[in-house]
C-alpha cells in the first residue's frame, strides 16, 4: 500500500511539473494578423450587396486580417490581371497573400470553358541511357487566349506567379447560384440551365478546381463546403433577395462563408 501511495504521489508531482509547459502551448492560426488582397466580383466587392459585411470582414474580425479589396461588381476572370496591377501599384509587395473568388460571371457571360493547353509536335534533345540526340515528341503549353475561361485563368495566374512568386495564392471556387433578375435586360437563370454557349455552371467550377493543379496553388472548394444551396427555399435565409436575387449573399450568408474559410485556411500557410 505504501508503495502504491508513493507511486501516486510521484505521478502527481510529475503532472504538476509538466502542467505549466502544456498550458503554454497555444495554437495560433496561420493567417492571424496577416494582410490579404482579395480579387473577384460582386461577391467580394464592398460596393455590391451586403456591403462591407462580406466574408472577408469575418476574416478581419476573427483573425485580424487586414483586407486589401480589389474586386469589382460584374467582372470576370479577364479582370484579374488589372486587379493584380492595382495591388502592386498601391502596396508593392507589402502584403502576405492573395485570395481569388471568381468565375460565376464568366458562366453568365457565356465564355467557353476551353482547354488548358495547346499541343504541337516538336524536336527536343533527350537521352535515357543512350547518346543524347534530338527526339520528336509532343509538347503542350498553356493556352494564353482571353476568349476562354481556361485561357483567362492561365493569363491571370501566369501574371500573378510572375509578379508575386513568393506569395501565397488561394483560389476559391464559385458557390452555387440560382435565379437573379436585375431588370429587363439582366435576367440570369439558375445553374439548372446551360448558359448561352451550352455549358453547365459546374463546368466552370471544375475549371477553377483544375486550375489548382495546373498552376500549383491551393483551392478551397466553396461550391462543395460552403453549405449554401440557393436553389432551395430553405436557404433563402442566406440570400440577398429570395424573389429577385438568389445570386448574392446577405450578411448571414457571408458570415457562414467566412466561418467556413476560417477553418479551411487552418490547413494552409499564409507566408513562407
Regions found by a protein language model. Give the residues of each.
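Alpha-helical cap/lid subdomain in secreted, periplasmic
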Residues: 62, 84-272
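Serine-esterase "nucleophile elbow" of acetyl-processing enzymes
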Residues: 22-73, 78-93, 98, 233-234
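Solvent-exposed, charged interface segments at domain starts and junctions
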Residues: 7, 22-34, 139-152
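Residues that line or immediately flank small-molecule/substrate-binding pockets and catalytic motifs
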Residues: 12, 40, 102
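Bacterial N-terminal signal peptides
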Residues: 9-20
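Bacterial N-terminal signal peptides that target proteins for export
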Residues: 1-10
